[in-house]
Amino acid sequence: MKFMDDSKKQEPREAEPMPSKQVTRRSFLGRSIAGIGGLTTLRATEAQLTDESGGVGRAAVRSQGRSLKSKRFSFVEILRVPDSVTLYGAVVKTLPVNPIRLVRNGEQWTSKGCVVESEVGKDSLVLTLTAGTMPMSLVHVRWTADVMPNLIVLGDAWERSYGELGWRGIEPERVMPWYFATHDGTICHGYGVRTDARALCFWQLDQEGVSLWLNVMNGGSGVILGERRLVMATVMIQQGQSGEEPFSGVQSLCRSLCARTSRPIVPIYGANDWCYSYGRSTAESILRDTEFTVGLSPRGGVRPYSVIDGGWENGTPRWPDMGVLADGIKQRRARPGLWVRPLEAAIGTPRSLLLPDARFGQAVARAQELAYDPTVPEAQQKIREKLHQVAGWGYEMVKHDFSTYDLLGQWGFEMGPMPTIPGWALNDRSRTNAEVLVELYTLIRESVGEAVIVNGCNTVGHLGQGIFDLQRTGDDTSGRQWERTRRMGVNTLALRLPQNGTFFVVDPDVVGITEAVPWKFNRQWLDVLARSGAATMVSAGPPAHGPEQMAALRDALALASAGGNAARPTDWMQTSTPERWQEKADSGRSETRQYYWSGPEGASPFLGP
């Protein structure tokens, strides 16, 4: 085993200065941050017989009305007609109201002119909704089962994660967007919806069964489908086998959920200025960063990126010409990238093109930030022009940000079971929020072209699969407080790493090399990023120019340019920030590396912005 913290001495902890006024990507842009469903007494009507993997066999179907066996299983068969389906036309404050309990007729569920179809296929279950002119907000699908009580469970996140991911025991109220996996100590099973879902979906698991909630809202109101038959989601399962590593099991689940062909997986590494400059960069400083990064990168093979994050303004003294700057980055043998906020609208934009202020609820200060409604054709054209301009300047990576917040009115950590605040709607009432998000992502891809690398930040990665090359999977890391990097960066790298190479390349955010963050931590963070095969981006503040830092950067960038060593966490079921990582050594044998993320004083309970 290799130990990545050479000190391991009880040395005084390095200072982590905290500025009096911290800047984040949110606050920089003026941000002011400030399941109750149809229960059923029905029991499962289909077979639950043990198969060779210790799960519930799909093959044997028992007659309706027979009681369940007393034995509990680690695998729950959900590729069958559900045991209940309940619709909700609206949400008031925080609660769904006006439940419509549907009546089953074969694979179809009906009531009051609404129809949910549960089409059982060989390896999937397709859920569709027809509701006519009746506004529809939520669909609650329930499968009853005797679930093994000692399972540990992993869920995903709505957009970026915020340090909350992890394997935990059964928590019946836990909201698990998109997919979840279980482990009984021997076998890992997975359940999820495909990435072409047209509803915002989350799962719940308890000892009496499984729930799938399909949010079909339009803004914060019920969608009005009219004559449309909405294919809400396709449910998939990944039944594990004894002896399979849990990481491989979750990776296989992610692969099975891909509804589109994933973009080519290529090494992504280089420079991003945010976590040392925090919006204070200039064209000149970007070129200096580019020269520094290129000088430490391998001369052949995949070229590094130099990404300009938030704070640039074309045609100003600090940023005189963004097209000329892109050319300057290319001349220095790097690939230029640029941060954009696609839905941001200028002051004076006609209200008819904008999203309603009501999407922010009581957070009225947020309404000062104007955003286009992407269901308005003229607003779509404004978004298209913005992206065309960036591609026309010659940028080879577009990092688009804030679209989930701008569209839905909340950050991921605020959403819980409700991604939007009730009481408002989009201009086009016939589209679900999930559909509008995918249409926006497709518009961005079409606007910049197939050759440009598209990086989604504050985006719903599950819905961006096959559209995005790269996805920021966690909230911001930091060049000002190590705790933020430990909590946000290490957590998202480890727990969402199964998405790397299946959905897209995962981007856990940058290594912010500054005086405020102890090098002994950043050195390890840099190392594990490069070895994992995830995007390895560096904000190189002045300390990065030290000899030890430059040597570590040279090694890490060389490894990242080659795609890493497929390092994966081995203690990810025991901790939210795994410290033991296994990779394939040059000899072909596995090698384990031990990292130390907390230091002698332990992790901080306090988190800076």
What are these regions (language model features)?
Residues 530-561:
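Catalytic cores of secreted or luminal carbohydrate-active enzymes
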Residues 1-18:
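N-terminal secretory signal peptides that target proteins for export/translocation
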Residues 526:
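Active-site loops and adjacent core secondary-structure elements that bind or stabilize anionic groups
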Residues 22, 42-71:
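C-terminal segment of N-terminal export signals and the immediately downstream linker at the start
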Residues 61-63, 67-300, 397:
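Carbohydrate-recognition beta-sandwich/jelly-roll modules
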Residues 14-36:
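N-terminal secretory signal peptides and thylakoid transit peptides that target proteins
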Residues 529-532, 537-540, 572-609:
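Carbohydrate-binding surface patches
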Residues 302-515, 521, 549, 554:
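Aromatic- and carboxylate-enriched substrate-binding clefts and catalytic-loop regions
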